[in-house]
Amino acid sequence: MAKKENRIIITLECTEARKEGLTPSRYTTTKNKKNNTERLVLKKYNPNLKKHTEHKEIK
C-alpha cells in the first residue's frame, strides 16, 4: 500500500498589490505539509510593481 504524499501544491499571492488595489502577482510552488504546518511567506518578484514583495500562501 502506498504512503500518503506529504507534498502539496500551494499558491503564493502578493500582499502589497492587494493593499493598493492593484492586480496581485501569483506564484505556485510545493511545500511539505508535515514539516511546514503554518502558512508560507516568501519574498518574490512582482512584475506589476517591478520590485520584490512579500507573497503569502492563500487557500
UniProtKB/Swiss-Prot annotation:
Protein name, entry field: Large ribosomal subunit protein bL33
SUPFAM superfamilies in alphabetical order: Zn-binding ribosomal proteins
Region described as Disordered: 26-59
UniProt GO cellular component terms: cytoplasm; ribonucleoprotein complex; ribosome
InterPro entries, per the entry: Ribosomal_bL33, Ribosomal_bL33_sf, Ribosomal_zn-bd
Organism per entry: Chlorobium phaeobacteroides (strain BS1)
Keyword terms, alphabetized: Ribonucleoprotein, Ribosomal protein
Keyword Ribosomal protein (UniProt): yes
Biological process according to GO: translation
PANTHER family in UniProt: 50S RIBOSOMAL PROTEIN L33, CHLOROPLASTIC (PTHR43168), LARGE RIBOSOMAL SUBUNIT PROTEIN BL33C (PTHR43168:SF2)
